[in-house]
């Protein structure tokens, strides 16, 4: 113990320590024909008013030689009540280049699960979150406190990486509304809430430097807010063509899809004997094309299967233990990047069409993003 403490205290005297602060500011103005922005939203950082502060993200990356890295960040944003909220998103250490090709993350981190969950708001390709993240993983995605082990094997034209984590799913305060929720049973109770295990495997194949393929297989198993279990599986695939190969710049085309399914064990809160399981799936197809320097257009189609389970009669009305409505959404985005000093910032114009139960909704958004600082430790 004494030796380890001495090592940590003296390491800065000879190690190369680098601290890199980052700042990301995202805001959006928009309008929707839906009855409210909540009808077409779902994620805590989705537009929720005619003007919304999606996030002021303050971060700090730590790098110590090649063996240790870390990251901490907090996000300030306007919530669904149009009040400022603060969220500690991540705070972890990453031990790199361990024997056998392993890396270890310890602390609070966004889980590597699917194509978006591990990305911060400023890295999104669209104004709003995808339905898989917001409807299956939570209003702020899936974050856990624990440890994650990653193994990477690289070959000539291919690589394989697998990450597996175990910990406690972070339950955000917004999800615990209190007594008024007693008879408002959406799909939120299916979110992970306690012990959680996740795994993500990525297969990469570079046919050439100009044509690249990525296939991801994902799984998550853990306790849910019904005090039962949710099991989730997903697959994502992306093909990328780059005019300049591995060099920056030039035209670039990306095509992809994501398919996810979950099995939710539910229990009606008013009748402990009313229990069961329900399965639900979601699908997305997306494409983006950088057709000129600083200009990118993107399109995304999403479908969420609607499911109901656990019917109970309450004061003359039928209520369900699990109730998730069917949704279809098409989003078109046009992004213009700008150089502000050494940093990339952007303006994004997006149109979305949502097919909701009983109504269709059209929404238009203009988003701005200001980014300062180098790449963050992931």
How should each PLM-predicted stretch be described?
Residues 18-20, 30, 203-322, 328:
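Detector for outer-membrane/organellar transmembrane beta-barrel domains
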Residues 28-37, 75-81, 113, 131-132, ...:
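Sequence/structural signature of outer-membrane beta-barrel proteins
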Residues 66-70, 100-104, 156-160, 208-213, ...:
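Repeated loop/turn-to-beta-strand initiation elements of outer-membrane beta-barrel proteins
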Residues 149, 332-338, 360-378:
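Outer-membrane beta-barrel "beta-signal"
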